[in-house]
């Protein structure tokens, strides 16, 4: 994802790769950029590069080497370089092996690590049986969705089914997705990929690259050749990251996006090598009922950075507290 983004998206020309390696393998990789403001605070720092389509900032860390030593070495080199007083990594997983190794390195060598309050996003852990929908949605709602699928089939004259458009070659599916996304409200708001210079090229290059590696999911809810909704996701190891979704607003009353979400869960369960699905979205989709905690990690690289990290973390906590109070009052 990094190379297509750097070639086609804003800020790519100012992005650097922070990496650690040996003569024969990569140990650590994180795209970064120099920043002069962070979360509204004037502060020079080094930050993970989070473009518009990057939903996880966790660095790549070798699974075959000691991650605590890797983190300690990276922090030590950055401190010696004195390039910035602070490294900020946004959208980092709060748990997991990479975060655990960083906290262990913090405990062992005193990195003075700080963390923002975590936010939750929709996630799915594999179940022994495909009970994802029945665990999170009542039977009456599921029956209503099944009825809508049957109604669509009758109206359109063909069964409504989901097709894996990435299997055996994309065959124009990328352009179909771009057209579908640009046909609705995203065109009106200017946020469709086709409406933003270079963004459609980024999507084409990314999708084709992942497809060539057998790591692209592009499921299409269709009635015959009529596309009702499409969903893309990226395979990474034992996980699946949700990416872009679109639906035909002419059929919104039949909830084609939700019908496709149900089929995505079935597709996920039928892939035994996959252990989890990160939707990379908020927690407002009942079908995806598990949660993943995401936070910003602040790694000081100097005495001034230690002070700045503490103040910035306190500011982020205060903002979250005030936002939570406003949300409770408006509920």
Q: Which stretches of residues belong to each language-model region?
A:
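Acyl-donor binding region in acyl/amide transferases
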Residues: 21, 37-117, 234-299
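Short intrinsically disordered coil segments
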Residues: 74-75, 135-143, 311-318
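Short beta-strand-to-loop capping motifs
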Residues: 61-64, 124-127, 165, 301
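Membrane-proximal basic amphipathic "stem/tether" segments
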Residues: 295-331
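Short C-terminal domain-edge/linker segments immediately following a structured domain
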Residues: 49-50, 59-64, 118-123, 151-156, ...
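A general structural signal for short secondary-structure boundary/capping elements
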Residues: 76-79, 133-137, 225, 267-268, ...
């Amino acid at each position: 994802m990094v190379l297509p983004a750097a070639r086609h998206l804003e800020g790519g020309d100012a992005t650097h790769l922070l990496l650690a390696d040996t003569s024969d393998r990569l140990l650590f990789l994180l795209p970064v950029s120099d920043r002069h403001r962070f979360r509204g605070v004037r502060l020079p720092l080094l930050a993970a590069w989070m473009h518009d389509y990057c939903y996880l900032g966790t660095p790549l860390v070798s699974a075959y080497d000691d991650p605590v030593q890797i983190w300690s070495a990276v922090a030590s080199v950055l401190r010696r370089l004195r390039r910035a007083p602070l490294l900020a990594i946004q959208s980092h997983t709060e748990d997991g092996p990479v975060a655990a190794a960083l906290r262990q390195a913090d405990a062992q060598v005193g990195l003075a690590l700080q963390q923002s309050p975590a936010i939750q996003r929709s996630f799915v852990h594999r179940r022994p049986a495909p009970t994802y929908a029945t665990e999170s949605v009542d039977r009456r709602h599921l029956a209503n969705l099944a009825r809508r699928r049957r109604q669509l089939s009758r109206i359109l004259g063909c069964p409504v089914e989901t097709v894996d458009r990435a299997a055996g070659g994309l065959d124009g599916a990328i352009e179909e997705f771009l057209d579908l996304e640009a046909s609705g409200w995203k065109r009106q708001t200017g946020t469709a990929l086709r409406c933003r210079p270079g963004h459609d090229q980024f999507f084409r290059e990314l999708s084709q690259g992942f497809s060539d590696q057998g790591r692209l999911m592009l499921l299409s809810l269709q009635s015959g050749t009529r596309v009702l909704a499409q969903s893309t996701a990226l395979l990474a190891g034992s996980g699946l990251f949700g990416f872009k979704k679109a639906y035909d607003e002419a059929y919104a009353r039949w909830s084609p996006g939700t019908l496709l979400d149900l089929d995505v869960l079935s597709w996920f369960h039928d892939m035994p090598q996959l252990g989890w699905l990160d939707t990379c979205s908020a927690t407002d989709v009942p079908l995806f009922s598990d949660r993943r905690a995401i936070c910003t990690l602040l790694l000081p690289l100097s005495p001034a950075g230690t002070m700045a990290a503490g103040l910035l973390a306190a500011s982020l906590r205060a903002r979250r507290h005030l936002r939570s109070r406003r949300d409770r009052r408006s509920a």
